[in-house]
Amino acid sequence: MKKIALTALAVFSLAASAAYADVVKVGVIGPFSGPFALQGKNFKAGIDAYMAEHGNKVGDDTVEVVYRDVPQADPAQSKALAQELVVKEGVQYLAGFYFTPDAMAVTPILKQGNVPMVVMNAATSSIVTKSPYVVRTSFTTWQTSTPIARVALDKGVKKVISVVSDYGPGVDAENAFKAAFTDAGGEVVEAIRMPLATNDFSPIMQRIKDSGAQGVFAFLPSDPTTLGFMKAYVDNGLKSSGIQLFAPGDLTQESDLPALGENALGVLTTFHYAVSHDSPENRKFVEEARKAIGNPAELSFPSVGAYDGMHVIYKMIEATGGKKDAAKAVEAVKGMEWVSPRGPVSIDPESRHITQNIYLREVAKADDGTYYNKEIQTFEKQGDPGLKAQ
């Protein structure tokens, strides 16, 4: 009987210590190996930069980040890892998610696990509609693809062909650009959706030339595919023939610019963040994030989504006193406003999506020979038009 009583006491003690633990774990799922490892590296750089600046404590609670690797889009693996993080690791927050399908797969477990999800990259608009416990600190493809339609028209381009990768964000990009472009009087002469695995773009380039379009709107996921597409755009004579290229900023992320080189010069994109953004907050962030990532040339946009994601999570921890309460945590950040390295931002209280400036950028060459995204126009306080289109 005494042994049973002691065992029961031990179990109760463990449960009590878990309930009042002063360590709050954040589980981050992202690509930390494989072809998209640089994006996961940027997640970690942004998180490390935030914690270097703000410390690892919120009140009396110590914040611990636990990472899990999903090298490529894999919804089943992402869901399994999220369940493992919640059940075995005891994380109170899930974050990261570079790929939309991975984020979508995890949303069903949020309510059951009583954990919020902070999306640091995945850009399909509808993610936030899948659970009231989702908050996004990155961007959506609708948000970054809509303003570039106005830019194309201002450049005198009336006929455009759309070329996107055939998955959630690509379809969002196609729809966003078409809606804004046609509403303003432009014509999308053809819409091409390419398999994600496409690596030979020559046939696509021929279709673009044959279409009679004055410009091409393109969306591909950052990293290997963008390099091949941009090279084909130049090698097949589209750039030299005056067919202008317009895109959201995924196409010219900073870590790709050394490889893109002269091919990218003059390309116009609209995006929520450039490493070159001129503000005190960004200069401070870039200094810390470059230390964290090791190679300054590798710093890119997922880092700022992760940095701001940690800012939101710290606010959630503060609001809940370190206790596990997803509803209270999310409620605490609705309407939250702050000055991010990217500029002024806020969390929309209805959609739980980030409202932010979108910048028109042109790829330029600095005096030292490096390439960068030069901001030349600001579209202020952009919400997510994609949610209205659902």
Swiss-Prot record:
Signal sequence, renumbered to the chain: 1-21
This protein's record includes keyword Cell inner membrane: no
Recorded superkingdom: Bacteria
Alphabetic keyword roster: Amino-acid transport, Signal, Transport
InterPro entries for the chain: BCAA_transport, Leu-bd, Leu_Ile_Val-bd, Peripla_BP_I
Claim: Signal is one of the keywords in the record: yes
Pfam family name, one: Peripla_BP_6
GO biological process: amino acid transport
PANTHER family tied to this protein: LEUCINE-SPECIFIC-BINDING PROTEIN, PERIPLASMIC BINDING PROTEIN OF ABC TRANSPORTER FOR NATURAL AMINO ACIDS
Function description: Component of an amino-acid transport system.
Family: Belongs to the leucine-binding protein family.
Record protein name field: Leu/Ile/Val-binding protein homolog 6
